[in-house]
Amino acid sequence: MVSVGTFVIEKGARLAFEIVRQEPCTCLCDPVWVTGLSLVDGSGETIRDEAYDPSVDTVEWLGRVAFVDDAEEPLSEGLYTVSIQTSIGEFSACVEVVASQRMARMGRFSASASVCGLELRVYRLLTDEDDGASLTLRQGDRLMVALAGNATTGFEWANTLLVEYAVLRETEQMEYRAKPHPAEMVGFGGTFLFRYEAIAQGSQAFRFVYRRPWESVQPKEIVEFSVHVS
């Protein structure tokens, strides 16, 4: 079992999970399939249990967990475990939910762990629902911004606020993932993914706009938020 911990988040937050193969591959080079995901609280009670049928290749899988109950109310402060079941065993992440004011007192963190070239990455997740939000991360935390859109229309999301001394470093180029659909069908929407890592203390603002890059018109959508790294 590969375990990451402890990832600290404020009440009501969302996390994203990826299993990434490091190259060049030295072992476990065959495809790895995700078969399920579960969320368990500190007393061992299962809050969420999701099975994938059919199973999903880790190359295409992106797990999302919202730390809210069935009524969309934030889960209580405390320790939780996210377990990801795969064809080669279990990956897990220990998560501590705290009040927002406690985030600044938490220490540095490494938001990944690996075995035999397979790395589990944990991200604080933001979407268009977080427009106007202000959140706190620790140095070493990862952030994923996932924005719905449709690349087949020519529209794309882009962060228009570029700073000289960034406290969050973009770790990969923007990725677009279309929703699963039959190969012969076109025009399906999907999600634009942006990945960052908190590398220094300070604050940084983000302004994502959804538009066609060649058009000189107002963006169709705007999502803004700020991040403080403690």
Locate each region found by the language model.
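N-terminal edge beta-strand
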Residues: 1-10, 117-144
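Beta-sandwich strand segments
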Residues: 92-97, 215-221
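Short, exposed beta-strand-loop hairpins at the edges of beta-sheets
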Residues: 83-87, 111, 209-219
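Extended, well-structured beta-strand/loop surface patches
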Residues: 21, 27-77, 85-100, 114
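A glycine-anchored, Pro-Gly-centered beta-turn/N-cap motif
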Residues: 76-80, 202
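Glycine-centered tight-turn and secondary-structure capping sites
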Residues: 196-204
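Solvent-exposed, low-complexity, repeat-rich "mucin-like" stalks and linkers
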Residues: 24-28, 131-157
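Short, solvent-exposed loop/linker segments at beta-strand-coil boundaries, enriched for Pro/Gly
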Residues: 152-154, 159-180
